[in-house]
């Protein structure tokens, strides 16, 4: 009952200071996935010669937060969310296997994990145990902050992105632009629902009290990645 209330109220608050303009939010339409399986919703199966990225937000697996990822077709603009995963029961140790299977399936998608906390373990399993080839890394470059790439080495390298104020701000504002200019399209009910309550708070953006923002954060990571030089080289996109 309480859960329903949260989901329901989170839907229709259409909060005041949403990251995405309310006029845009009102036009977003959801469709049913073509395939559903234990938290994985597929909207479009992998297509030959298409390029995909997956961005991952890892929860501790104790019920409050959801571990989540989105798969985005980045072959050309508009980019499109073709699959999403969201599960609040999955144990962090099992999550990498799901990430691996889905990413492989989507033409060995590039993966970018958020590595603040337990995400670091997930990324390590992908890199060292499963030996996934297309894991994106980040390197700290002083005032430039984190830059993204592959095959970095050295002390200041992480197997993913550390969610910092800067990353969150840059990612959020770029996400706003991408969505409002129709450069990113999606038809997932939960993504739309989270964006409806993803609001400006204390000079940052986060979910309204009692709502979730796991998928929204995956999109923020994606939007941060898209404006990186490395991504532009990867795809020849501006």
Question: Model features per residue range: what roles?
Answer:
Residues 1-56:
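ATPase catalytic-site recognition across NTP-hydrolyzing enzymes
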Residues 84, 213, 220-238:
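Acidic two-metal-ion nuclease catalytic site recognized across multiple nuclease folds
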Residues 75-202:
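Mg2+-dependent endonuclease catalytic cores in nucleic-acid-processing enzymes, primarily RNase H-like
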Residues 4, 14-18, 105-108, 181-188, ...:
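Intrinsically disordered or highly flexible coil/loop and linker segments, enriched in small
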Residues 165-166, 207-215:
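Structural motif
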Residues 12, 26-29, 58-62, 73-76, ...:
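Short, flexible loop/turn elements at secondary-structure junctions
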Residues 47-74:
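Gly/Thr-rich phosphate-binding beta-strand-loop-beta motif of the actin/hexokinase/Hsp70
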């Amino acid at each position: 009952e309480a859960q329903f209330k949260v989901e329901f109220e989170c839907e229709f608050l259409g909060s005041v200071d949403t990251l995405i303009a309310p006029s845009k939010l009102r036009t977003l339409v959801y469709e049913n996935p073509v395939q559903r399986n234990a938290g994985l919703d597929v909207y479009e199966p992998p297509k030959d010669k298409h390029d995909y990225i997956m961005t991952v937000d890892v929860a501790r697996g104790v019920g409050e937060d959801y571990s989540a990822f989105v798969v985005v077709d980045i072959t050309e603009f508009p980019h499109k969310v073709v699959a999403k995963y969201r599960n609040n029961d999955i144990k962090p140790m099992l999550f990498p296997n799901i990430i691996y299977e889905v990413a492989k399936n989507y033409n060995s998608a590039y993966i970018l994990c958020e590595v603040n906390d337990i995400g670091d373990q997930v990324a390590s399993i992908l890199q060292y145990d499963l030996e996934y080839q297309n894991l994106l890394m980040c390197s700290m470059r002083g005032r430039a902050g984190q830059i993204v790439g592959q095959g970095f080495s050295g002390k200041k390298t992480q197997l993913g992105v550390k969610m910092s104020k800067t990353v969150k701000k840059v990612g959020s504002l770029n996400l706003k632009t991408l969505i409002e200019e129709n450069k990113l399209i999606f038809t997932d009910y939960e993504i739309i629902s989270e964006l409806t309550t993803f609001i400006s708070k204390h000079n940052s953006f986060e979910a309204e009290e009692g709502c979730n923002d796991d998928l929204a954060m995956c999109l923020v990571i994606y939007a941060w990645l898209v404006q990186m030089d490395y991504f532009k080289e990867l795809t020849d996109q501006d």
